[in-house]
């Protein structure tokens, strides 16, 4: 097989709490991550040269080493030079559907797909933990994107503990086209404003993680209780992003007032989502929010949660 086409799902955060600082400059986090059906399409194809060639179609994404998908291919070449010698370089074709700089791990999902695609293309036979270990060298969200589904993520987000399949929601997703939020800015601003409350000793952080594990959100996921899950979603970064970006705060308020079980910003934003039990309910929330907002700068998506990460679309 000389090419593989893969589906790279986006993710939403059902929970994001910042515990404190890490020695490496990142934050110690507790997150609950959930894959959704909205995703990019990535094709990896042997090209008969030694080169990585990345095509992003109509997307404004760069096609060089500033792109995570390109860096994922370079990482595989560096780690498996014999496979690169045997199979040669790769053409990567990326078709974007996940909005960029949106808090949905679009770039991370693309990188994860390249790792999985080259594992298949080069017949490496890597295990999921091996792929996740490689992914962690590129970015904090990428290990989750490999297997996807529902997971609690700790450390800087790369330590994963799979949870029972939380695939029980329809999701209304919305984002301002003109607004991008810098993830480093969001975390740095949170540190400036709330750093005095950080738990910076291991014992306190362990105790807090244990409390979250035993808390109502995780219990709701264990028992597949959509109402309980949606009632306990939480994102610390809303405290800094929403005051700094009033249109995002307004979008969140409009979505929340349109119905559904629960509304929140995903990751560092600016995407906002509402969880719904059924497709019909989600369609109603979408229609009401569109009518209330009437803003041509806002894009909406209707999607649903899924129980997997990267998948082969064809072979």
From Swiss-Prot:
Enzyme Commission number, as recorded: 2.7.1.148
Binding-site residues for ATP, renumbered to this chain: 99-109
Pfam families: GHMP_kinases_C, GHMP_kinases_N
Enzyme class: transferase
Active site: residue positions: 11, 141
Keywords linked to the UniProt accession: ATP-binding, Isoprene biosynthesis, Kinase, Nucleotide-binding, Transferase
Family: Belongs to the GHMP kinase family. IspE subfamily.
UniProt name for this protein: 4-diphosphocytidyl-2-C-methyl-D-erythritol kinase
Organism: Synechocystis sp. (strain ATCC 27184 / PCC 6803 / Kazusa)
Gene from which the chain derives: ispE
């Amino acid at each position: 097989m000389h090419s593989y086409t893969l589906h790279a799902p986006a993710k939403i955060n059902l929970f994001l709490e910042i515990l404190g600082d890490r020695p490496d400059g990142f934050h110690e986090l507790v997150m609950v991550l959930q894959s959704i059906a909205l995703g990019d399409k990535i094709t990896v194809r042997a090209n008969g040269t030694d080169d990585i060639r990345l095509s992003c179609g109509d997307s404004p994404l760069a096609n060089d080493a500033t792109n995570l998908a390109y860096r994922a291919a370079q990482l595989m070449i560096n780690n498996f030079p014999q496979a690169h010698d045997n199979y040669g370089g790769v053409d990567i074709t990326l078709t974007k559907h996940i909005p960029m700089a949106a808090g949905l791990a679009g770039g991370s999902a693309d990188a994860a797909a390249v790792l999985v695609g080259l594992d298949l293309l080069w017949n490496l036979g890597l295990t999921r933990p091996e792929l996740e270990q490689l992914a962690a060298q590129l970015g904090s969200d990428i290990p989750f994107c490999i297997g996807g589904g529902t997971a609690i993520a700790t450390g800087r987000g790369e330590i994963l503990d799979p949870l029972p399949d939380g695939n029980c929601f329809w999701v209304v997703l919305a984002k301002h086209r003109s607004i991008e939020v810098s993830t480093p800015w969001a975390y740095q601003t949170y540190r400036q404003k709330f750093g005095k409350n950080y738990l910076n000793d291991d014992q306190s952080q362990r105790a807090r993680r244990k409390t979250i594990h035993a808390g109502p959100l995780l219990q709701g996921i264990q028992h597949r209780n959509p109402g309980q899950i949606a009632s306990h979603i939480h994102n610390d970064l809303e405290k800094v992003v929403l005051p700094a970006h009033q249109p995002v705060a307004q979008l969140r308020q409009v979505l929340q007032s349109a119905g559904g079980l629960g509304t929140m910003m995903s990751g560092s934003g600016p995407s906002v989502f509402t969880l719904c039990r059924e497709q019909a309910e989600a369609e109603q929330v979408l229609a009401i929010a569109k009518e209330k907002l009437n803003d041509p700068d806002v894009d909406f998506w209707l999607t649903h949660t899924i129980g997997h990460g990267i998948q082969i679309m064809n072979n």
